[in-house]
């Protein structure tokens, strides 16, 4: 793996900068943690070398003075929004996050449900959490937000929200994903704290967009692709340009909310400590890029991956045409096409020859392998076996799983479990070679290569089952699929790992 990001430097200078910001405020600091506190796989993909739990490591250094508030939007609860990298809904991820934080000794005292307008699903979720002993608060949608500053900064605006009880000087506000309303929760709390005579401050810790990279740098374009469903747009921060004469990149929601922030600080302090949305942030990631070209290329690949995710979601009714169009436009800005993904090209070339579902993998060393569907194996399962054999130095013609073993598995799947697809999935072939490894050295060698698949890139010419998607995800393999449900076989095929 080529590294483009210095994670050790990042941990050092980022934690120092956060501590400096905390010291500038008095009684309490609300810090909005954008992105993900851990499992930040997007950052690790576009900034090779960034560790997914880097933010958590920094927070652990301040855990005695910090508590966490988790935010979830009632809108996301209502539509069962999925966290794509983990395959679980946001409402389930709130509980997962809470458990993860508490297991590390961090204090998590409450959950805030934002954008609440009486949704039955949100009310049911609140009852469920309260039944588990979790304190839950409602924050309502405010008409005209974020532009109607007079209403927002009043008892009819933030004043209608529940006051979130906190006890520590540092309050970290986080969420399962973007668009949950973290900033609004922080601002509401500043208003509520001021009413109670408490001088509270606000800061923002968000990795993307990286403010000191160019507007159309692939790293920043990849952030727009990741948030296409939120209609976020990166832009030059006009306030920063006016105050300092320097160009800085921010995104539209921060720029839109800045007048509200200024008005709130004027009420609390009599002045605003920030001259621009960029000033509110504490992001030091841009100073830790060690190889710009590596990060550019990784980000371009991420944009392509997001494009395929969007078109597959659109085919399943889970995304809008506007989301697809936006990412397509970002690809043009980055001067890339789907042909810039090598596994995609290889899979489609194999499809033209075989006229059946195919898949291709690009390994970390640049090697490309392909596979197609057969009567015994799906293309992803066959591809996985091919990759393991290659990495283990096992000749291609060697069959890791005897046909005599596959046949009874298929019989069970179809005759007894009443499945429609007799072909083995990726998890089933892994279980099979795990069993055989007790008596077969080749299977043992193949299994030992599983960790070496991390970072590989796969493309499938058909949309995969949830089982196969999760298997690739657990192995750390990047996956893209064409928005096709099934390819009819033009010729009958025998079992083959090829």
Predicted region positions:
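A short, polar/charged loop-to-alpha-helix boundary motif
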Residues: 376-392
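Residue-level structural signal for beta-strand termini and adjacent loop
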Residues: 201, 373-375
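The conserved Walker
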Residues: 177-178
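Hydrophobic positions on the alpha1 helix immediately C-terminal to the Walker A/P-loop
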Residues: 185
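Short HxH-centered metal-ligating active-site micro-motif
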Residues: 390-422
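Flexible phosphate-sensing "switch/lid" loops adjacent to ATP/NTP-binding sites
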Residues: 1-174, 189-351, 355-356, 363-365, ...
């Amino acid at each position: 793996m080529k590294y483009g990001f210095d994670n050790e430097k990042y941990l050092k200078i980022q934690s120092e900068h956060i501590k400096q910001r905390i010291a500038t405020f008095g009684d309490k600091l609300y810090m909005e943690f954008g992105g993900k506190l851990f499992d930040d796989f997007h950052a690790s993909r576009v900034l090779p070398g960034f560790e997914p739990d880097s933010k958590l490591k920094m927070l652990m250094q301040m855990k005695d003075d910090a508590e966490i508030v988790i935010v979830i939007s009632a809108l996301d609860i209502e539509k069962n929004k999925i966290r794509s990298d983990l395959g679980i809904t946001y409402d389930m991820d709130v509980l997962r996050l809470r458990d993860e934080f508490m297991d590390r000794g961090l204090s998590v005292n409450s959950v805030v449900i934002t954008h609440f307008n009486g949704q039955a699903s949100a009310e049911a979720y609140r009852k469920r959490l309260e039944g588990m002993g979790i304190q839950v608060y409602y924050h309502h949608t405010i008409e005209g937000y974020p532009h109607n500053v007079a209403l927002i900064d009043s008892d009819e605006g933030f004043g209608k929200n529940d006051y979130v009880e906190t006890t520590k000087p540092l309050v970290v506000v986080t969420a399962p994903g973007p668009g949950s309303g973290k900033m609004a929760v922080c601002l509401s709390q500043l208003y509520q704290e001021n009413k109670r005579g408490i001088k509270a401050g606000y800061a923002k810790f968000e990795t993307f967009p990286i403010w000191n990279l160019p507007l159309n740098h692939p790293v920043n374009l990849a952030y727009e692709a990741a948030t296409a469903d939120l209609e976020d747009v990166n832009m030059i921060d006009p306030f920063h340009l006016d105050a300092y004469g320097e160009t800085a990149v921010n995104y539209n929601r921060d720029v839109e909310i800045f007048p509200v922030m200024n008005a709130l600080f004027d009420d609390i302090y009599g002045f605003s400590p920030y001259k621009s949305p960029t000033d509110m942030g504490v992001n030091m990631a841009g100073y830790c890029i060690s190889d710009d070209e590596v990060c550019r290329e990784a980000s371009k690949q991420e944009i392509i991956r997001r494009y395929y995710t969007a078109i597959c979601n659109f085919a399943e009714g889970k995304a809008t045409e506007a989301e697809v169009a936006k990412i397509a436009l970002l690809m043009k800005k980055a001067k890339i096409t789907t042909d810039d993904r090598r596994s995609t090209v290889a899979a489609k070339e194999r499809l033209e020859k075989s006229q059946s579902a195919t898949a291709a993998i690009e390994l970390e060393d640049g090697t490309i392998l392909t596979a197609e569907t057969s009567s015994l194996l799906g293309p992803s399962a066959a591809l996985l076996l091919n990759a393991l054999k290659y990495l283990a130095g096992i000749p291609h013609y060697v069959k890791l799983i005897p046909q005599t073993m596959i046949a009874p598995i298929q019989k069970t799947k179809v005759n007894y479990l009443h499945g429609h697809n007799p072909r083995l999935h990726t998890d089933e072939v892994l279980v099979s070679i795990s069993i055989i490894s007790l008596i077969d050295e080749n299977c043992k060698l193949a299994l030992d290569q599983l960790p070496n698949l991390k970072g590989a890139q796969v493309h499938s010419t058909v949309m995969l089952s949830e089982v196969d998607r999760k298997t690739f995800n657990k192995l750390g393999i990047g996956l893209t699929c064409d928005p096709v449900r099934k390819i009819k076989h033009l010729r009958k095929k025998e079992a083959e790992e090829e």
